[in-house]
């Protein structure tokens, strides 16, 4: 066991010297100087994985740090994607911006605790789970209006859809009069027979 200023700031020892008959003693006072030591740091994830659609403000992890000299600690985050998260003065790591699994399925952030002199770091590994999102859909008419004698098979409009999870898109039509039109697997809407 080494010296620890936080445990004892000094030691008073008695040094004895003996020749077998006579003993001489002298007091030794050993002073221990304080050295600013790095804080200790640990963190706990709130869950093993987080859905990409979790609300901003959700607590992702909680950090716990202590300083041997009882100095005030400040927390910070760094690393790719750290702009999506924030850490407060209590060590709570929260989500501050929306996540997208298709952009990043995980984040490895560096959590730091500093006493102003020394800094300790820890890694927070955050796993993101996919949520099946609705496809995006756009359409454009081939013309602003069509004559009542427009030929069967004439393209009326074109639809375009894409799915964030790259799933197969299926088109369909509904509503009053939809039986007068057909849509194929490419999104071409034509006049039906």
Model regions: which residues?
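Acidic, turn/loop-rich segments in luminal/extracellular domains of secretory-pathway
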Residues: 1-38, 48-58, 63-136, 144-153, ...
